Each structure stands twice: as C-alpha cells, then as structure tokens.
Regions:
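Cell-envelope and extracellular/periplasmic
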Residues: 1-183
Length: 183
C-alpha cells in the first residue's frame, strides 16, 4: 500500500545508523480539526512519539527526527482557505512541540504533504492553496511532495489502490530528498 511504497523510497536514502519506524494514523473522511490537540488522533501521535523514543533508547539510538506524511484535505474541501491554513500551521506547531518534549529540544520535524485536488464551489481550491502557502512560508520544515491531480480516484474523493501506492512513493521520494539534504 501507500505506507509500504513511501517506506521503501525513504529506506533507500537511510544510512547504516538510521532506522525507520512507521505508524499509520489514518482517519478516513476526517477534517483537520480532528487531528489537533486535544483530540484523540493527536494524543495517539503523542503516544507514538514517546514509544519511538523508548524503542530508540532501547537500541542505543537517539530519536531525533519525525517525518509526517500528510495526506488529507478532501474532507475539508469546503473549509475556508485561511482557516485551513491556520489549522494546518497549528498542527505543524503542535507536532514540533510534542517532538521537542520527547527529544529534549533536539528533534527535527519534516511535514510532507501533497497538494490535494479538493475543490469547493466552481474551481475554488482553498485547501490546496493553503497547503502551498504553508510550504512556502516554512520551507525546509513543510514540503510539497507534488500535486495529486494526476492520481485516479474511484469516486472523485478516494484514490484507487494503484494511485494510493503512487502517492506513497511520491511522498517517500520527496522525504528522501529532504533527509539527504537535497532540498
């Protein structure tokens, strides 16, 4: 699936001292607000961060990097542009703060997203514009893997399986480039 294809692309760029732990916190048809604190999805992320730090420590490693592959936006197609941008920025800030807690301020957050095709009204793309603006404003921390317009959807919203795998690979390659210092 998409997580496997993303992981495969990321692993190609890891060094011998690096490890990759992947966690799927997918929530189908969920608006961005459900991922913000104090909601359960964010508490799950906090638990995963603590566990990742424990696993790394148990192996004599340091947990220092959180990479988020953010594939969301269709559920927020009607969310006003500025509101979505503000919520997305808040999510990035909250994730960075949660990471800082478990890494004693030594962590690095890379937030990778792909530009959704979500539209509202005729041709209005507030979510995709907000995603682009945040990536420009926070270059290096927030990265765009690319647009999603070329991926096939089964019902206009959900990706077909083959397209989901392609999206995972798109994210994985973008993340690998950033981790290698190419961006």
């Amino acid at each position: 699936g998409p997580l496997t294809s993303a992981s495969a692309a990321i692993i190609e760029g890891l060094g011998p001292q690096d490890r990759l732990l992947t966690v799927n916190l997918a929530r189908r048809n969920t608006r961005i607000a459900a991922f913000l604190p104090p909601e359960e999805a964010f508490r799950n992320v906090e638990r995963c961060l603590r566990r990742a730090a424990e696993i790394a420590s148990g192996q004599g490693l340091a947990f220092r990097r959180l990479v988020v592959s953010w594939v969301q936006g269709q559920a927020d197609a009607r969310t006003p542009h500025r509101l979505y941008r503000d919520q997305l920025g808040r999510l990035v800030d909250e994730l960075a703060a949660a990471l800082a807690l478990v890494t004693e301020g030594q962590g690095q957050l890379v937030f990778c997203l792909s530009q959704t095709t979500a539209t509202y009204y005729i041709g209005r793309r507030g979510v995709s514009l907000a995603q682009l603006e945040l990536a420009k404003a926070r270059a290096g921390q927030v990265i765009l893997a690319g647009p999603e317009y070329m991926l096939e959807r089964s019902d206009g919203v959900h990706l077909k399986p083959r397209s989901a795998v392609r999206l995972g690979a798109l994210h994985g390659r973008a993340i690998r480039r950033v981790l290698a210092g190419a961006e």
